Amino acid sequence: MCPHRLVLEHVTSRWGVLILIELLDRPHRFSELRRAVGRFGRGVSEKMLTQTLQTLERDGFVHRDAKPVIPPRVDYSLTALGREVAEQVRALALWTEARMGEVGEARERYDAAKRALGAATQDDPRA
């Protein structure tokens, strides 16, 4: 697989998108980020959040700041590169949200056409 496609997969993955958008507002601790991402539907597991954060950190999008205190404190924030990609992802998410009415209408037209085609096929004795 081409390296740029792999990075695109990381950025546009189910959790990658939500993490990047959430970190645009401010840095988050792990538990804060997990709760914030969970607001968008089914929650993310600790394992998946950890894996996604590590992947985004490796790609240079997320900075992990572990503070040597007790109890341990780790903050996650966007790098300059991460902020740039997160703004692009957020723009796509906002566009999608704004166009959902049109997408819904297109889906209804498509489904109606498929149903009509299916009914016509059932009525045709040659089928």
Each language-model region and where it sits:
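Canonical helix-turn-helix DNA-binding module
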Residues: V37-P71
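N-terminal helix-turn-helix DNA-binding core of bacterial DNA-binding proteins
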Residues: C2-M48
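Generic detection of well-ordered alpha-helical segments
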Residues: S13, V17, Q54, R83, ...
